[in-house]
Structure formats: structure tokens, C-alpha cells
Amino acid sequence: GSCSFCAIHSHQGRIIQTRSHESIIREAKKITELPNFKGYIHDVGGPTANFRHPSCAKQLKVGVCRDRQCLFPKPCPNLDTDHSDYIALLQKVRALSGIKKVFVRSGIRYDYLLADKNDRFLDELCRYHVSGQLKVAPEHVAEHALANMGKPGKSVYLKFMRAFNKKN
């Protein structure tokens, strides 16, 4: 994302570091074995839940682009917006013995979600991984402030809000 006000890329780097499904599944299994575990995994996500992988194949070869951000002012044509890996991970965790519910409580990038060619992730998210409310970060509604922040305009948030409300 690299929003201009956010420190995440400063201390974690601009290339997203991915944990393997196996690592997350192992950790979830350990959690289910805890004596006080009640069946709820409260978050499967990272700093931005739905950004699990480097943004594009180019990042793995030559690093991040110096002259642009992946999502601002509009999504890069090379941006990999497919959420199917994250969907598969959530399904695997959800299928573990002893799990009642798996939540996604890390903030999601709604502009990244909307850039996906299909709405399968939004379906999955609303059906299985939220309690009716979802954590997103519409930091402002004034267009000039959003532009200075490196965030999409208010219309993108409203489009997401309509899509979420329709599914939820």
C-alpha cells in the first residue's frame, strides 16, 4: 500500500513477507490445544489482512518500483489482485478440528479487494469471517487530504461500502 502517513513499510519493508500456509496451520493447531481455547481464531491476517504476497512478480526480481505505488493513484496494471491463496488459507484454518469461527480483524485494503477481478473473496469474507462489521481504514473523506495520504478517493470507499452491505 505505502500510504504516505503509514509507518508499516518503513519498519517492515515495501515488499510483503509471506508466511506459509503450513506455518499458520501449525500455529492454529497449537492454539486449539490450549486449555482455555473456546473455538475462535480472532485474526488471520497481517498488517493488511488481504495483502499476503508481494504485489507483483517484478518485486521478486528487481524490487519495488521507485516511481510509483502499487495502488495509488490507481492500481498498477502489474498488481496481482487474486485473493484465492488467502481464501484457501482461511478455508484450511476454518476446517481444523475444534475451530468454530475464524475472524479477519486486521484491516483490509478495500481498494485492493475491489481491484480483484471477481468478488469471491468478499463473498467468503462476509459469509465466514466477519461478525457483521469489518475493520477498514477510510482515513478521511476530503479528496485533497486523501490524495496527500496516497489513498483512493471517497468514491472507492463508497463503492466498497455498497458491495459489502449488499453481501453482508
Regions found by a protein language model. Name each.
Residues 3, 24, 136:
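Conserved, mostly hydrophobic/aromatic
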Residues 18-27:
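Short cysteine/histidine-rich metal-coordination sites, predominantly Zn2+-binding motifs
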Residues 1-19:
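Canonical Radical SAM [4Fe-4S] cluster-binding loop centered on the CxxxCxxC motif
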Residues 30-168:
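Conserved SAM/AdoMet-binding glycine-rich loop
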